[in-house]
Protein backbone atom coordinates (compact mmCIF):
# COMPACT_ATOMS: atom_id res chain seq x y z
CA UNK A 1 0.00 0.00 0.00
CA UNK A 2 0.99 3.61 -0.58
CA UNK A 3 0.08 6.93 1.02
CA UNK A 4 0.96 10.04 -1.00
CA UNK A 5 1.13 13.58 0.32
CA UNK A 6 1.83 16.12 -2.44
CA UNK A 7 2.61 19.44 -0.77
CA UNK A 8 0.47 18.48 2.22
CA UNK A 9 2.94 17.71 5.03
CA UNK A 10 3.84 21.37 5.57
CA UNK A 11 0.17 22.13 6.34
CA UNK A 12 -0.50 19.39 8.90
CA UNK A 13 -0.98 19.85 12.59
CA UNK A 14 -0.28 18.11 14.85
CA UNK A 15 2.76 16.95 12.90
CA UNK A 16 4.12 14.19 15.15
CA UNK A 17 0.72 12.62 15.70
CA UNK A 18 0.10 12.71 11.94
CA UNK A 19 3.33 10.77 11.30
CA UNK A 20 2.29 8.20 13.93
CA UNK A 21 -1.11 7.82 12.25
CA UNK A 22 0.50 7.43 8.82
CA UNK A 23 2.76 4.70 10.22
CA UNK A 24 -0.20 2.88 11.77
CA UNK A 25 -2.20 3.00 8.51
CA UNK A 26 0.54 1.41 6.42
CA UNK A 27 1.20 -2.31 6.27
CA UNK A 28 4.71 -3.63 6.96
CA UNK A 29 5.71 -3.13 3.32
CA UNK A 30 3.83 0.14 2.98
CA UNK A 31 5.32 3.23 1.39
CA UNK A 32 4.86 6.89 2.26
CA UNK A 33 5.58 9.40 -0.51
CA UNK A 34 5.74 13.06 0.48
CA UNK A 35 6.58 16.10 -1.64
CA UNK A 36 7.48 19.24 0.30
CA UNK A 37 9.17 22.59 -0.33
CA UNK A 38 12.87 22.60 0.53
CA UNK A 39 13.87 25.59 2.64
CA UNK A 40 17.56 24.88 1.94
CA UNK A 41 17.08 25.28 -1.82
CA UNK A 42 18.89 27.80 -3.98
CA UNK A 43 15.78 29.93 -4.43
CA UNK A 44 14.94 29.84 -0.69
CA UNK A 45 18.41 31.11 0.11
CA UNK A 46 18.28 33.78 -2.60
CA UNK A 47 14.93 35.20 -1.51
CA UNK A 48 15.31 34.69 2.24
CA UNK A 49 12.20 35.67 4.20
CA UNK A 50 10.44 36.64 0.95
CA UNK A 51 10.55 33.09 -0.49
CA UNK A 52 6.96 32.35 -1.51
CA UNK A 53 7.15 28.68 -0.47
CA UNK A 54 7.39 29.73 3.18
CA UNK A 55 3.71 30.61 2.59
CA UNK A 56 3.05 31.77 6.14
CA UNK A 57 0.59 31.19 7.78
CA UNK A 58 -0.61 28.28 5.63
CA UNK A 59 2.71 26.43 5.82
CA UNK A 60 3.16 25.47 9.45
CA UNK A 61 6.39 23.53 8.90
CA UNK A 62 9.48 24.00 6.77
CA UNK A 63 11.75 21.10 5.88
CA UNK A 64 15.26 20.44 4.64
CA UNK A 65 16.32 17.01 3.38
CA UNK A 66 17.92 16.37 6.77
CA UNK A 67 15.00 17.47 8.93
CA UNK A 68 12.40 15.41 7.09
CA UNK A 69 14.65 12.35 7.16
CA UNK A 70 15.05 12.71 10.94
CA UNK A 71 11.31 13.24 11.35
CA UNK A 72 10.58 10.08 9.40
CA UNK A 73 13.13 8.10 11.38
CA UNK A 74 11.64 9.34 14.66
CA UNK A 75 8.30 7.87 13.61
CA UNK A 76 9.42 4.48 12.34
CA UNK A 77 10.36 5.19 8.73
CA UNK A 78 13.51 4.78 6.65
CA UNK A 79 14.19 7.19 3.81
CA UNK A 80 14.40 4.91 0.76
CA UNK A 81 14.59 7.48 -2.04
CA UNK A 82 14.85 11.21 -2.56
CA UNK A 83 14.00 12.96 -5.82
CA UNK A 84 14.28 16.62 -6.79
CA UNK A 85 11.40 18.64 -8.21
CA UNK A 86 13.54 21.25 -9.98
CA UNK A 87 10.70 22.81 -11.98
CA UNK A 88 8.95 24.00 -8.81
CA UNK A 89 11.64 26.70 -8.63
CA UNK A 90 10.17 28.46 -11.67
CA UNK A 91 6.70 28.81 -10.15
CA UNK A 92 7.96 29.70 -6.67
CA UNK A 93 10.42 32.26 -8.05
CA UNK A 94 7.80 33.93 -10.24
CA UNK A 95 5.35 34.03 -7.32
CA UNK A 96 8.04 35.45 -5.03
CA UNK A 97 8.89 38.18 -7.53
CA UNK A 98 5.20 39.01 -7.92
CA UNK A 99 4.67 39.12 -4.13
CA UNK A 100 7.68 41.41 -3.78
CA UNK A 101 6.04 43.71 -6.35
CA UNK A 102 9.21 43.83 -8.40
CA UNK A 103 9.22 44.90 -12.03
CA UNK A 104 9.05 42.13 -14.64
CA UNK A 105 8.22 39.35 -12.14
CA UNK A 106 7.83 36.73 -14.87
CA UNK A 107 11.25 37.42 -16.39
CA UNK A 108 13.00 37.76 -13.02
CA UNK A 109 11.30 34.59 -11.80
CA UNK A 110 12.33 32.67 -14.91
CA UNK A 111 15.94 33.78 -14.46
CA UNK A 112 16.03 32.73 -10.81
CA UNK A 113 14.12 29.55 -11.65
CA UNK A 114 16.70 28.71 -14.31
CA UNK A 115 19.58 29.30 -11.90
CA UNK A 116 17.81 27.18 -9.27
CA UNK A 117 17.21 24.44 -11.84
CA UNK A 118 20.93 24.33 -12.68
CA UNK A 119 21.82 24.23 -8.98
CA UNK A 120 19.43 21.28 -8.54
CA UNK A 121 21.09 19.44 -11.44
CA UNK A 122 24.43 19.65 -9.63
CA UNK A 123 23.13 19.19 -6.08
CA UNK A 124 19.75 17.47 -6.01
CA UNK A 125 19.28 18.28 -2.33
CA UNK A 126 19.11 21.97 -3.31
CA UNK A 127 15.96 21.53 -5.42
CA UNK A 128 13.13 23.94 -4.64
CA UNK A 129 10.91 21.00 -3.67
CA UNK A 130 11.75 17.38 -2.98
CA UNK A 131 9.92 14.06 -3.19
CA UNK A 132 10.72 11.66 -0.36
CA UNK A 133 9.91 7.95 -0.43
CA UNK A 134 9.78 6.40 3.03
CA UNK A 135 9.44 2.73 3.98
CA UNK A 136 8.51 1.42 7.38
CA UNK A 137 11.39 0.24 9.55
CA UNK A 138 11.38 -3.51 10.03
Give the ranges of each region predicted by the language model:
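Generic, low-specificity signal for short hydrophobic/alpha-helical stretches with a mild N-terminal bias
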Residues: 4, 50-54, 112, 116
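Generic structural signal for short, flexible, solvent-exposed coil/loop and linker residues
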Residues: 36, 49-57, 121-123
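Short glycine/proline- and charge-enriched loop/turn segments
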Residues: 47-56, 95-102
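Residue-level detector of anion-binding/catalytic polar loops
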Residues: 78
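A C-terminal cap/extension of S-adenosyl-L-methionine-dependent methyltransferases
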Residues: 81-138
Amino acid sequence: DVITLWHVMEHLEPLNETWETLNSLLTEKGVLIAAVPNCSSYDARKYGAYWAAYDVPRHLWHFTPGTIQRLGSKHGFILAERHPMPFDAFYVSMLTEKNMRRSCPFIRGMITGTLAWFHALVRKERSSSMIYVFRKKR
